[in-house]
Amino acid sequence: MNDFPWLTIIVVFPISAGSLMLFLPHRGNKVNKWYTICISILELLLTTYAFCYNFKMDDPLIQLSEDYKWINFFDFYWRLGIDGLSIGTILLTGFITTLATLAAFPVTRNSRLFHFLMLAMYSGQIGLFSSRDLLLFFIMWELELIPVYLLLSMWGGKKRLYSATKFILYTAGSSIFLLIGVLGISLYGSNEPTLNLELLANQSYPVTLEILLYIGFLIAFAVKLPIIPFHTWLPDTHGEAHYSTCMLLAGILLKMGAYGLVRINMELLPHAHSMFSPWLMVVGTIQIIYAASTSPGQRNLKKRIAYSSVSHMGFIIIGIGSITDPGLNGAILQIISHGFIGAALFFLAGTSYDRIRLGYLDEMGGMAISIPKIFTMFTILSMASLALPGMSGFVAELIVFFGIITSQKYFLISKILIIFVMAIGMILTPIYLLSMSRQMFYGYKLINVKNFSFFDSGPRELFLSISILLPIIGIGIYPDFVLSLASDKVESILSNYFYG
C-alpha cells in the first residue's frame, strides 16, 4: 500500500480543474485554451514524476496501490494501482491529450465546454487504465462515453449528430454485455461478491460459464477496439469529428478495447481465451486484409485514415491471440505505436483541412508546393504507418510475426497461412497510404484554382508534429524502452497458459 495517493490525484485532478473552468467568469477563449494546456502539462509531469520515483520495472505485481472503502452499502471500493500493462497506456494518454488540447486551438465556438470535456475524458481514461476493481473499471468505461458523445455531436462536420448517435448506440449497447460480465464474475462462487481484480485472477470457473463471460467481455471490447464486423461506427465518427477529438479517439479510445481484452479476457479467463484464440487470429488476419482493401475506396481523407487504424488493430488482435511472449509484447508495442501514428495522421489531415476546406481526396491535388512542411510531415508519418524500418510500427509488426512463428499452439501450415495473408495486407497498406499522399500533394488540381494561396504550418503545428514524430522514431530505434515496462507482467499473464 502506498502512503501518498498518487493515482487518486492523477485521476481526479483533470476533471476537478476542468470543472473549475466552468464556474469561473468568462475571460475569453485564449484564457480557457492556455488554462487547459497548463492543466494537461501539469498532469503529464505529475504522472511522469510519480511513475519515475515509485514504479519498479522488475516487479510484475500491482504498484502504487490504493484501496479505500467507497460505498458501504454496496461494499464498493475505490481500488487503483498500476503494473507494466497499464503504465504505458497511462503515459500515452497524458502525452496525446496534452497535444490534442494544443491542437484544439482553432476551436472558438463554446470553447470552455469543449476544453472541459477534453479534461473529463482525460480523467475517465486514466481512471480506466489504473482501476483495480471491476465495477470501477465499468464505471470509468461508461463515464468516458459522455464527454466523447458531446465532443462528437457538438463540434465537427455536417453529419456529426448522425455519427455521434451511431457511436453511442454501438458503445452503450455493447456496455450491457460488459455489465452482465462484471456482475456474472463478481457473483459467482463466493458467499460475498468480490470485484477485486487481483482476487479474481486466481479464481476458476466452470467451462460453460467462462465461455459465456468471455463472449460478453469480447463483444464489449470488440466494439471499442474495433473488431470487424463491429467497426462501422469508426469511419463515420472519424469522418465527422473535429481533428483534436480524432486524435483522442485514434490515440487512446481504441486502445481501451485492446487493454480490456488483455486485462480481463486474457488475465481472468485463461481457459476460454485459449479456446477462442484461434478465432482471434483468423479475425485479426481478415481484418488486416479487409480494412486495407476497403481503404482505397474511401473518398473522404479522414475515413481512409480510419480504415488504416482498423487494419493496424488487426495486428493487436493477432498478437493477443498468439498467446506467446513476443506476440503479446508486440501487441502492447503496437498499442503504443499506433497511438502516436494514428493521432499524428489525423492531426495533419485536420491542419490541411483548415487551410483548403476540402475533405475529399478527389478534390485535392498539388498541395505540396504551397505547404511543404505539412507535406514533409505527412509523408514521414505515412511511412511510419506503413511500418517503415526505423519507425515504431515496423518493430511492433515484426515482433507480432515472431509471436506467430514461435507459438506452440498452432500447426505449421496454419502459421504459414496466417503469415501469408498478413503479408498481403502489409503489401496493400503502402498502396492506399501512398495513393492518398499522391492524391493530396501531387498533380496540379488546386494550383489551377483562382486565388489559390494558403499558409504553411505555423510554429504550433510544427512543434506538435515533431513532438509526436520523436517518440515514433525513438521507439523504432530503441523498442526495449517500452518492452521492458511490460515484459514481467506479460510473463506473469502467460504463466496461466500451458504452452508458449
UniProtKB/Swiss-Prot annotation:
Annotated TM spans: 4-24, 35-55, 87-107, 113-130, 134-154, 167-187, 211-231, 242-262, 272-292, 305-325, 330-350, 386-406, 416-436, 462-482
Pfam families per the UniProt record, alphabetical: Proton_antipo_M (PF00361)
Reactions performed catalytically: a plastoquinone + NADH + (n+1) H(+)(in) = a plastoquinol + NAD(+) + n H(+)(out); a plastoquinone + NADPH + (n+1) H(+)(in) = a plastoquinol + NADP(+) + n H(+)(out)
Keyword Isomerase found: no
Localization annotation: Plastid, Chloroplast thylakoid membrane
Keywords: Chloroplast, Membrane, NAD, NADP, Plastid, Plastoquinone, Quinone, Thylakoid, Translocase, Transmembrane, Transmembrane helix
GO biological process terms on file: ATP synthesis coupled electron transport; electron transport coupled proton transport
GO CC annotation, single: chloroplast thylakoid membrane
Coarse class of the protein's main subcellular location: plastid
Protein family according to the UniProt entry: Belongs to the complex I subunit 4 family.
Alphabetized HAMAP family for the sequence: NDH1_NuoM
Protein name: NAD(P)H-quinone oxidoreductase chain 4, chloroplastic
Gene source species: Lobularia maritima
Phylogenetic classification of the source organism: Eukaryota, Viridiplantae, Streptophyta, Embryophyta, Tracheophyta
